[in-house]
């Protein structure tokens, strides 16, 4: 995410043993944000969600299970960055308002989590912007050529 320094990548501390893993996604005081909405998305391999964003919400995102290729883009500078998030690396990305994000599932199955922080009402679909996953303005190097898309994301194609 070097090309877009407003986007922050975090590596939480975690504990692993023969039973599995334990890690903290967020605790009060970690960020100067009040998170007020959580969402979880499950998808299969080659599903591409996004690119979506809005003008008022911060998003802390992570992959709880599986592996995804996350893309975050700055709609003003037209720069983008990418990172692989997985249950192995446990990395998290904090995305500021006005930035778009999308992800493609690399594993057979993935569970993706968003923590949202915003003032007022939730910025639902009508308050969000969408950018086509293959918009030539950004020339994003997605790791999949024929992604599985929602109707909403196909319309931006």
Where are the language model's segments positioned?
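Non-catalytic, conserved peripheral segments adjacent to functional cores
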Residues: 1-91, 109, 116-157
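Short HxH-centered metal-ligating active-site micro-motif
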Residues: 94
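Ligand-binding loop in jelly-roll beta-barrel domains
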Residues: 97-119
């Amino acid at each position: 995410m070097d090309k877009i320094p407003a986007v922050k990548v975090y590596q939480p501390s975690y504990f692993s043993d023969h039973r599995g893993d334990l890690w903290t996604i967020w605790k009060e005081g970690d960020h100067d944000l009040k998170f007020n909405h959580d969402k979880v998305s499950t998808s299969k391999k080659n599903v591409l969600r996004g690119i979506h964003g809005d003008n008022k919400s911060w998003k802390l995102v992570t992959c709880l299970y599986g592996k995804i290729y996350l893309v975050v883009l700055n709609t003003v500078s037209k720069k983008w960055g990418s990172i692989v998030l997985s249950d192995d690396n446990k990395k998290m990305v904090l995305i500021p308002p006005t930035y778009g994000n999308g992800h493609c599932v690399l594993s057979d199955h993935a569970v993706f989590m968003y923590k949202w922080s915003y003032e007022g009402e939730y910025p639902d679909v009508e308050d969000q912007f969408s950018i086509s996953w293959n918009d030539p303005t950004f020339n994003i190097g997605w790791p999949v050529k024929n992604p599985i898309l929602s109707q909403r994301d196909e319309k931006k194609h």
